[in-house]
């Protein structure tokens, strides 16, 4: 048989396959499984939908003109490859046989990442766009007035009371599930009809056009607003606002300059701040001012301490939040300079709930990345109230080359506010003069105040700013005193052997044995675990306290923790026989057994270092103190034995 006959036979067979391929059972059975994309395009689209005339030439021409698949014979291969690569689970197909190298990540760094970068524990990570025109807001009742602004409640325009009250401002501890917590039923307060507060800044220069003078005179109010730099556009030179939001700094949603809105009570309350004031000979074509839109808070600290029963545990949480705010401001070289109880705002839903605290009113703030202020004449403003100025500020005398340092001014003011929280009276309002008082003249705190809080407050009010405790160290000490751990936190630390590891040297953790630091990591693991588990039991630990713990854990470091532990175990008499590292390790290991039934075999094979004494600095015996009247401030026990 010649090759010509073979060619004719193959040609006829091919024609029959093309003509009847769409109806062949074998194609219908295997093509969808092997090449689903090819089958859908080639069989369903081409063979079924296209009419097939008998003329082969016309049939081929129609296929070419309609689909062009003759010019792309391998297009199905590309389609299959694209489908395979887009599968979400293909990377996990060989996961059991993959071996990842262990990452050497420091435990403290991991804890900071968990509580600093997770939306669950840090609602400030969530951002919301807010309108920048005053017509987009509806004003409510008058809330208060100062020398430079009036504050009104507000909500977004064209929104009813229900939608405004349920406006969502961020995730976090407010979204804790109640299923596992088994929270007892409580009466909920009515939703706020006006959840915002708008600060209407007073413009006393309506005869000037433009926005530059408004930004220069009112820009300090934007210190806690992360987007302030974009609004100011370099008008304030060295002004450096806070780079991010913080749970204990007032939440500014947005700020903008717009036309002056004359409210019904404006003429009665602040006539001099209106463009209708009698001394203006001419005014700008469009009177403007700055508006600062903030979250609305329930009460000031001054109102709270006089309307609520004193609770020393609640007071300690409030003071710790205040110190967290001071720590954040100190870190970014921002001084609020007017730290008084009227400028501390609180938010809570129920009367017996521990409030969340924020520092507000930054109109007198110093935010130029420098603590020093040239004080050459009395015309230079040092900000704030005379009764709440730190001693180094109150005693400053103007002169040539005189500089005033505000680094520790807010920290000192926090000490006076701590007195007000615990006793309802700030000693510097009437009893003492900030410029002349002596530390021995400070009034005694109630005996039921926790000993750590008592010592921290006295150290905050040191006259010499160089001897004053840093805000982060003070905040650490109070935060550690608030951890429950199923017992008094001091007893827990004694079991851990921490009392034998504190030294007189600040920052001694750098030279501590690696093994001892690893045991400190175990303790921090327990504290972190308790904080995470508290998320499942919100009826035991308040929302404010959970947020406080997350803030503390998101910024902690070992060096500051060791320095803070001196408030629990102050340095005392030197050891006659210095403890070895093995003694510390055994003591620390004993702590683990008190929290886990499975820890009996924990590091039984751990061998002490041969040069253990050389790896540990000189250890000092510590004086163990207890609270007066035996009160440790524990309210609830997370774990009962």
From Swiss-Prot:
It catalyses: L-seryl-[protein] + ATP = O-phospho-L-seryl-[protein] + ADP + H(+); L-threonyl-[protein] + ATP = O-phospho-L-threonyl-[protein] + ADP + H(+). The active site is at residue 338. Keywords: ATP-binding, Kinase, Magnesium, Metal-binding, Mitochondrion, Nucleotide-binding, Serine/threonine-protein kinase, Transferase, Transit peptide. The keyword Transcription does not apply. The keyword Nucleotidyltransferase does not apply. Its cofactor is Mg(2+). Residues 137-483 form the Protein kinase domain. Autophosphorylated. Pfam families: Pkinase. SMART domains: S_TKc (SM00220). It comes from the Eukaryota. GO terms for biological process: autophagy of mitochondrion; axon extension involved in axon guidance; axon guidance; cellular response to oxidative stress; mitochondrion organization; mitophagy; positive regulation of mitochondrial fission; positive regulation of protein ubiquitination. Residues 1-74 form a transit peptide. Its EC number is 2.7.11.1. ATP binds at residues 143-151, 199. One of its GO terms (molecular function) is ATP binding. One of its GO terms (cellular component) is mitochondrion. PANTHER family: SERINE/THREONINE PROTEIN KINASE (PTHR22972), SERINE_THREONINE-PROTEIN KINASE PINK1, MITOCHONDRIAL (PTHR22972:SF7). Protects against mitochondrial dysfunction during cellular stress, potentially by phosphorylating mitochondrial proteins. Plays a role in mitophagy. Belongs to the protein kinase superfamily. Ser/Thr protein kinase family. This is Serine/threonine-protein kinase pink-1, mitochondrial. The gene is pink-1.
